[in-house]
């Protein structure tokens, strides 16, 4: 499977962790059995799907203000993947 060049996820209407996981799953092509939690997110991005070359998280500042804990966890997981699996990780743009 080849990696997409760019995936953009609009976070401006995300107001709950469930909405966030649904948006991530839809945009990144997670399987239907995705568990909608951070452990499942890690499993999905590191072994179930090919991450895009670039991932743009649009509306990040307002999203991070609304859901700071979720934003911190997402940012941490994406940074961890970039450190541990640089060839598979997306270059993330927090826009």
Predicted features and spans:
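Positively charged, polar, low-complexity stretches
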Residues: 1-95
């Amino acid at each position: 499977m080849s990696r997409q060049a760019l995936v953009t996820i609009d976070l401006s209407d995300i107001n709950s962790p469930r909405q966030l996981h649904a948006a991530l799953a839809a945009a990144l092509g997670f399987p239907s059995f995705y568990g909608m939690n951070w452990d499942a997110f890690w499993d999905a991005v590191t072994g179930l799907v090919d991450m895009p070359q670039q991932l743009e998280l649009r509306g990040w500042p307002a999203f991070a203000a609304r859901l700071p804990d979720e934003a911190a966890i997402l940012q941490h997981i994406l940074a961890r993947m970039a450190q541990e699996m640089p060839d598979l990780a997306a270059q993330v743009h927090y826009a």
